């Protein structure tokens, strides 16, 4: 695996020498704007692999994306390669529909230590929940970013990530009640502890998430990519673009329903993805918002 190929894939041409917050932020932003958060393998009849060589081939060489276990594993490798002190952590994702955090550790995120300060770096949550900058690991501090205001809080060794969102304007009235829309201004995202993990800790859940009928990842096909102003999402046959803070503390959310040919065209034109196998778009009943 070639670190230069990774940086070429994300379009990063800046310094790799300074192991500071500015460099970490720059790399994170390049990755989330180049590498989609997506689960299309599942809906093309292919596996979501955890092996780093396979992930590198999929994302860097074949210009695909991946889900958190893949894109954050790749980010962990890249940051470690250039000298950042990086630790894999495990997260428990909040389900709004059930009003609770997952019982299984289904999310992979990173802790990066710079000059004695700890930061959370996560390139694998996508949609309008995706951080654009690393979050300083300080309990109770509001950390405003372009997508929203993020906050980390700690209680008896467990950390919680939440966000305060803007109002949203949906010009296409047909989608005002879409099940893809986040309805809450305040939103819990996930919890985690600071216990170091390895990729092996995620092997069983990686299998479960792509095989179980109860998994949102088998219920819905999705692809999400950040832009300098917002985020594109394709869920099943529905394409959305959210422009953050387009006016008066309000996000603009545009919806469009695509046919199969348009899905293929938009995957290529918006997400830079050309699939090798046929995609079966799916919008099942499991809770998933953009």
UniProtKB/Swiss-Prot annotation:
Substrate binds at residues 106-107. It is found in: Cytoplasm. It is an enzyme of class 2 (transferase). The keyword Acyltransferase applies. The modification N-acetylmethionine is found at residue 1. SUPFAM superfamilies: Cysteine proteinases. One of its GO terms (cellular component) is cytoplasm. CoA binds at residues 103, 208. The keyword Transferase applies. GO terms for molecular function: arylamine N-acetyltransferase activity. It catalyses: an arylamine + acetyl-CoA = an N-acetylarylamine + CoA. It comes from the Eukaryota. Participates in the detoxification of a plethora of hydrazine and arylamine drugs. Belongs to the arylamine N-acetyltransferase family. This is Arylamine N-acetyltransferase 1. It comes from Bos taurus.
